[in-house]
């Protein structure tokens, strides 16, 4: 039943991404659907701002870092953006890249980060679990597909914005 629900949620998310008229709307689709698709305890949307990242939104069992900023090289979301690839960490306390002091007060034990944006990623989708080695391969594959679909949405929105700005009188 979980697998069916994941696919149903994925289908809904893809439809909503296809209708999104702003980056903010697309990010909201990600935030609202990723947690259920991944059977996760929390999700965050992290935006790149120069050499920093800012936690722009979250849906989690307990507060994480909404509104806080961190140097891009010192967090997994930043590394996923820099490396332009998803990062899955089944146990954050076994991975030296994770700033353990920042995570100790939270529920997070396992996590995955998915970069968002074509070319140079502009954001990342963070998915968090309260247990070690939590993610099923199906869930990770669907979350990766969701992030890639969001990338297509971001590209479509950027092209639409460029066209609108190039019109006389715009």
Kindly give the residue locations of the regions a language model identified:
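Signal-transmission linkers at sensory-effector interfaces
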Residues: 1-24, 36, 153-170
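A short, aliphatic-rich beta-strand micro-motif
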Residues: 109-117
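Sensory-domain boundary capping and coupling elements
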Residues: 77, 116-129, 153
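Signal-transducing coupling segments at domain and membrane junctions
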Residues: 60-65, 90-110, 129
